[in-house]
From Swiss-Prot:
One Pfam short name: C2
Binding site for Ca(2+) 3: D320, S323, D326
Region feature (Cysteine motif): 12-38
Free-text remark on how the cofactor is bound: Binds 3 Ca(2+) ions per subunit. The ions are bound to the C2 domains.
The name this protein goes by in its record: Synaptotagmin-6
Taxon lineage: Eukaryota, Metazoa, Chordata, Craniata, Vertebrata
Annotated membrane topology: Single-pass membrane protein
GO terms for biological process, alphabetical: acrosomal vesicle exocytosis; chemical synaptic transmission; regulation of calcium ion-dependent exocytosis; vesicle-mediated transport
Cellular component terms (Gene Ontology): cytoplasmic side of plasma membrane; cytosol; exocytic vesicle; membrane; perinuclear endoplasmic reticulum; plasma membrane; synaptic vesicle membrane
Major localization class: membrane
Subcellular location(s) of the protein: Cytoplasmic vesicle, Secretory vesicle, Synaptic vesicle membrane
Record: residues binding Ca(2+) 1: D260, D266, D318, F319, D320
PROSITE patterns: C2
Phosphoserine modifications at: S216
Length: 510
């Protein structure tokens, strides 16, 4: 019988299940044998399809319930550990009864006295400094402890502060005049509880004061280097009236500085008759010598009437075959009639002035000054300019003159002339008037700037000159002559120079 139950496929199983259900019915249907129905009633439970399906469903349900229960228990334990156990442990670790006394105890006089005794111990200084650093981010430390620790650290550092006196300078002295309007540095209030202690200069400032004066020494060295002599040069001048030619004879140079590694130089000389730089003449190169003898003649065709407006420019160079030639120095002879009338040859010795590049002739400007003391009126008349530097690609400039009234390095007023187009020798004859009381004449100066007008872009400065008590050279002499002869126009030619960086920064001197 077991073979009968196990034989067949799914359809046989379904047929057997239908027969079994019919046999279990009461009464059995007609046509069914009683023995056959009894055998179906005695069928093993595991062979019954319905019983097997019911057992499988119960097992799966039990497994699902167990898994869900375990997951819920795990979630509950995790939440309990996160919400209850961790805060309780941190609170117990960070809040012992003896770590932080109550605020009332910190504010008591006995606690402050004990804290002051502990602060006197130098061994606790490192710990206190660390506490001050931590107090900025630690809200648990009381504010009273932070303030007392900071006061002790400040008092201790003031006693150990090193004081040195920096080198005085004119720039700082001039700044002190404007200091009271801003703040009094020496009168800063450090609080009533911390009186300023007497500061004693340390041994560093006494032993090596030159360390603090190094900046001023460097400035003096740079100034002396700019004015030092680089040897001497000997030349002669003579004018040939028949051919209207100026004859310049370069004779020799003496005591030139060494520019090569071997301790010598390869000098030669360039000659210009300014303002014409297109005509450039040059001597031969003399190898490995610091005292060359040139003995060469150079001819410049120029009318005798123009000699007063010409300048002789000599530039001494060191020849270098494989790189740029080094400039040794230069000599500029402003007055060709300085030694004689050029009717006969005259020998001239000049010091070679230190220079790193050839000087550029920017031109000259002629103006007159006239002061009326009774009216307090200063009149500057711009007459003309000559030989201005070409600023445009056309070889010309569009010059105009700007006059600025300065007082203690500050510009009070400025006025301009008209613009002259496409010329290097403009003529203006325009008067510029400033109202200046007589008592203020020693405090003001005039800055005359020759500008090149550009339709597109910024206007460029061709050159400047300055007149006033604080000016130098001809600018000061012209100003003093105007004051000596009031109500009389005093006219002079002034050479234009480049705007120096020191003047841009507010230095009243050019």
């Amino acid at each position: 019988m077991s073979g009968v139950w196990g034989a067949g496929g799914p359809r046989c199983q379904e047929a057997l299940a239908v027969l079994a259900s019919l046999c279990r019915a009461r009464p059995p249907p007609l046509g069914l044998d009683v023995e056959t129905c009894r055998s179906f009633e005695l069928q093993p439970p595991e062979r019954s399809p319905s019983a097997a399906g019911a057992g499988t469903s119960v097992s799966l349900l039990a497994v699902v319930v167990i898994v869900c229960g375990v997951a819920l228990v795990a979630v509950f334990l995790f939440l309990f550990w996160k919400l209850c156990w961790m805060p309780w442990r941190n609170k117990e670790a960070s809040s012992p009864s003896s770590a932080n006394p109550p605020l009332e105890a910190l504010q008591s006089p006995s606690f402050r006295g004990n804290m002051a005794d502990k602060l006197k111990d130098p061994s606790t200084l490192g710990f206190l400094e660390a506490a001050v650093k931590i107090s900025h981010t630690s809200p648990d430390i009381p504010a009273e402890v932070q303030m007392s620790v900071k006061e002790h650290i400040m008092r201790h550092t003031r006693l150990q502060r090193q004081t040195t006196e920096p080198a005085s300078s004119t720039r700082h002295t001039s700044f002190k005049r404007h200091l009271p309007r801003q703040m009094h540095v020496s009168s800063v209030d450090y609080g009533n509880e911390l009186p300023p202690a007497a500061e004693q200069p340390t041994s560093i400032g006494r032993i090596k004061p030159e360390l603090y004066k190094q900046k001023s020494v460097d400035g003096e060295d740079a100034k002396s280097e700019a004015t030092k002599s680089c040897g001497k040069i000997n030349f002669s001048l003579r004018y040939d009236y028949e051919t209207e030619t100026l004859i310049v004879r370069i004779l020799k140079a003496f005591d030139l500085p060494a520019k090569d590694f071997c301790g010598s130089s390869d000098p030669y000389v360039k000659i210009y008759l300014l303002p014409d730089r297109k005509c450039k003449l040059q001597t031969r190169v003399h190898r490995k010598t610091l005292n060359p003898t040139f003995d060469e003649n150079f001819h410049f065709p120029v009318p005798y009437e123009e000699l007063a407006d010409r300048k002789l420019h000599l530039s001494v160079f060191d020849f270098d075959r494989f790189s740029r030639h080094d400039m040794i120095g230069e000599v500029i002879l402003d007055n060709l009639f300085e030694a004689s009338d050029l009717s006969r040859e005259t020998s001239i010795w000049k010091d070679i002035q230190y220079a790193t590049s050839e000087s550029v002739d920017l031109g000259e400007i002629m103006f007159s000054l006239c002061y009326l003391p009774t009216a307090g009126r200063l009149t500057l008349t711009v007459i003309k300019c000559r030989n201005l530097k070409a600023m445009d690609i056309t070889g010309y400039s569009d010059p105009y003159v700007k006059v600025s009234l300065l007082c203690d390095g500050r510009r009070l007023k400025k006025k301009k002339t008209t613009i002259k187009k496409n010329t290097l020798n403009p003529v203006y004859n325009e008067a510029i008037i400033f109202d200046i009381p007589p008592e203020n004449m020693d405090q003001v100066s005039l800055l005359i700037s020759v500008m090149d007008y550009d339709r597109v872009g910024h206007n460029e400065i061709i050159g400047v000159c300055r007149v006033g008590i604080t000016a130098e050279g001809l600018g000061r002499d012209h100003w003093n002559e105007m004051l000596a002869y009031p109500r009389k126009p005093i006219a002079h030619w002034h050479s234009l120079v480049e705007v120096k960086k020191s003047f841009k920064e507010g230095n009243p001197r050019l």
